[in-house]
From Swiss-Prot:
This is Geranylgeranyl pyrophosphate synthase. InterPro entries: FPS1-like, Isoprenoid_synthase_dom_sf, Polyprenyl_synt, Polyprenyl_synt_CS. It comes from Schizosaccharomyces pombe (strain 972 / ATCC 24843). It is an enzyme of class 2 (transferase). GO terms for biological process: farnesyl diphosphate biosynthetic process; farnesyl diphosphate biosynthetic process, mevalonate pathway; geranyl diphosphate biosynthetic process; geranylgeranyl diphosphate biosynthetic process; protein transport. It is found in: Cytoplasm; Nucleus. Binds 2 Mg(2+) ions per subunit.
Length: 351
């Protein structure tokens, strides 16, 4: 059996080597519109800067999932189609992150200054929209003659809407003031992470692979949604924990959730278990800028044993996800190994 680490890195190199093809496709679209050459280069640089630099897990997932579904190595045309869709998901991720950094007033992303700090808020907003808008044009350019073309367009549009709906609720729930803290609860949190994270991070790559493999089994799609929600929940709670207790040098970004008044797993449970005095402390310091406020909240989390609760949660989620993977009906064409690989990527991660 091929070593998973070497296999992943070999595929990753091929995926990265393919990215210029995607950029060239965008260039051809812009040239057909007679867009100005100098501005074309600026936009292509923005796309490159805001798409590259991550772990590429979503793009890799399309390639690895398709390989598992057809149970053989990908032919060149199959690799090309899967790599294209993988990069479209990475571009979608890039546009979400650009907007997210503006809304959260973040400083660093993937170890670099956030794009809005480089080019200004107005240009960064418009370029995030351009990243999103180029996706259906690239799908039309490369897949318009395929039988799954409409399904592909529909899937990207739906997932984009669901993700932005989750982002909207995340934004509204983190509005300034004590009232927002009182509105934090696990039901609201579940909604945010289901729509903000699960669909584009887990469901979309696998759905793309299912479409490429010509699998139209509804049960396979339903199972994919169910497991994607579980994986997304686990992934986002990890994100919340790492934002507070992770190592910046490993994460490549500065944690902002406490001062940004975010509805996180940590604050939901802190509210649930806090005494009256602790709740007053939480309301006095949560959502406030300044290292002293952040230190108070982190100390409160320790007093409430939130880190210990997180580690128990992680163990329970590992057990639940493992059991759900074992229940997958492979007669639908879906493969257990697809979700196992996803699970291995995020299992007790540190970034």
């Amino acid at each position: 059996m091929v070593n998973d680490f070497n296999e992943k890195n070999g595929i990753k190199k091929r995926l990265l080597d393919f990215f210029p093809v995607v950029l060239e496709g965008i260039r051809e679209i812009l040239e057909s519109m007679q867009y100005f050459p100098e501005e074309t280069e600026k936009l292509l640089y923005s796309i490159k800067r805001n798409t590259l630099g991550g772990k590429n897990n979503r793009g890799l997932a399309v390639l690895q999932s398709l390989t598992s579904l057809i149970n053989r190595e990908l032919e060149e045309a199959e690799f090309r189609d899967a790599a294209l869709l993988g990069w479209l998901i990475e571009i979608l991720q890039g546009c979400f992150l650009m907007a997210d950094d503006i809304m959260d007033q973040s400083i660093k992303r993937r170890g670099l200054d956030c794009w809005y700090l480089v080019v200004g808020v107005r240009r960064a907003i418009n370029e995030s929209q351009l990243l999103e808008a180029c996706i259906p044009l690239l799908i039309r350019k490369y897949f318009r003659n395929m039988p799954y073309y409409v399904d592909l367009l529909d899937t990207f549009r739906e997932v984009t809407f669901l993700t932005e709906l989750g982002q909207q609720e995340d934004l509204l729930s983190s509005r300034d003031g004590e009232a927002s803290l009182r509105s934090f609860d696990l039901m609201k949190y579940d909604f945010i992470i289901t729509y903000k994270t699960s669909f584009y991070s887990f469901y979309l790559p696998i759905k793309c692979a299912l479409l490429l493999s010509r699998n139209s089994n509804q049960k396979a799609y339903d199972t994919t949604i169910k497991l994607s929600k579980l994986l997304g929940y686990y992934f986002q709670v990890q994100d919340d924990y790492l934002d507070c207790f992770g190592d910046y040098t490993v994460l490549g970004k500065v944690g902002m959730d406490i001062q940004d008044n975010k509805c996180t797993w940590l604050v939901c449970y802190a509210e649930k278990f806090a005494s009256a005095d602790q709740l007053n402390l939480l309301r006095a310091h949560y959502g406030k800028a300044g290292s002293e406020n952040i230190a108070v909240i982190k100390q409160l989390y320790h007093e409430l044993q939130i880190p210990e609760l997180y580690h128990k949660f992680e163990d329970d989620m590992v057990d639940s996800i493992s059991k759900e993977i074992d229940l997958i009906d492979e007669s639908t064409g879906l493969k257990k190994c697809i979700f196992t690989k996803f699970f291995q990527l995020i299992y007790k991660r540190s970034r």
